[in-house]
Design a protein with these regions (language model features):
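Short, solvent-exposed loop/turn and secondary-structure capping segments
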Residues: 32-39, 70-73, 82-84, 209
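Aromatic-rich carbohydrate-recognition surfaces in CAZymes
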Residues: 57-182, 195
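Alpha-helix N-cap/helix-initiation sites
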Residues: 12-16, 81, 191
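Sec-exported extracytoplasmic/periplasmic mature domains
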Residues: 4-8, 22-28, 73-76, 88-92, ...
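Extended glycan-interaction surfaces of carbohydrate-active proteins
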Residues: 22, 39-43, 47, 132-163, ...
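Catalytic cores of carbohydrate-active enzymes
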Residues: 98-99, 179, 184-229
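Acidic/polar, glycine-enriched structural segments that form the non-catalytic walls/loops
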Residues: 1-56, 88-89, 96-97, 133, ...
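Generic structural "secondary-structure junction" signal
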Residues: 10, 29, 35, 57, ...
């Protein structure tokens, strides 16, 4: 019983109902497409082929990377392993060998960023992924080429995505976590490159307003007449 793995002390009946209702909904997704016979239909493959093993779907990494997946590793490590191996199979079965940042059930990618990189890297660091080669090849391709990230060339050249502060901050965080996976696997050169790139968040911090702000391609912050608003 997944709900029973967390035992609460204190709290009234209403608070307990609220907690376990939220936990129940948290565990509904991502969802497995594996059928009782051990096979699955793949919405990621070009022709909807049938494969063996786990397959994961119905999850958006933009918010789940910092909520659902850490919870799985802490409380449900068996579930985390099954789910992450299902995502690695999704990478294998996709024609471009990339992870859908939002799957429903196939590739939708309606969320910005590449936060799935963080969940896959976390899986490597927690020894929750069986096919580490496929997982790492995805991480390398996604962080070091234009195949995985929108506006990658500008991001690599300028250190940020012009006009998009949220997207840039997402990339910095992904770079940092993937650098830790690279270090763990012994890829020191790539680890150093990504770690240094992750520190470029400083480029978007405006000391006048004390906010992160978007920059133009020429390196300028927007000019506000009233910086208190």
């Amino acid at each position: 019983n997944l709900l029973g793995r967390i035992k609460l002390t204190g709290g009234n009946e209403k608070e307990l109902m609220k907690f376990y209702s939220i936990l129940y909904r948290t565990l509904l997704f991502p969802r497995s497409l594996k059928e009782p016979g051990g096979v699955h239909y793949s919405p990621y493959s070009k022709h909807g082929d049938v494969y063996n093993g786990e397959l994961s779907t119905d999850s958006g990494f933009w918010d789940a990377y910092r909520t659902v997946y850490p919870l799985m590793h802490l409380v449900y490590p068996d579930y985390a392993k099954k789910t992450l191996n299902g995502w690695v199979n999704a990478i294998k079965e996709a024609p471009d060998k990339m992870l859908a940042q939002w799957a429903s059930p196939g590739k939708v990618d309606s969320m910005e960023g590449a936060m799935g990189e963080i969940s896959i890297a976390e899986g490597i660091l927690n020894n929750a992924i069986d096919d580490v080669d496929t997982a790492w090849n995805y991480l390398y391709t996604s962080t070091c080429t234009s195949a995985g990230r929108e506006h990658f060339d500008l991001y690599a050249m300028l250190g940020y995505v012009p006009g998009q502060v949220s997207l840039s901050l997402n990339y910095y965080l992904s770079d940092f976590v993937v650098s830790k996976a690279a270090e763990y696997l012994g890829f020191e050169t790539i680890a150093t490159k990504l770690f240094e790139r992750s520190k470029q968040w400083k480029l978007l911090f405006d000391r006048d307003t004390k906010f992160f702000l978007p920059k133009s391609e020429k390196g300028r912050f927007p000019q506000y007449t009233d910086k208190t608003k």
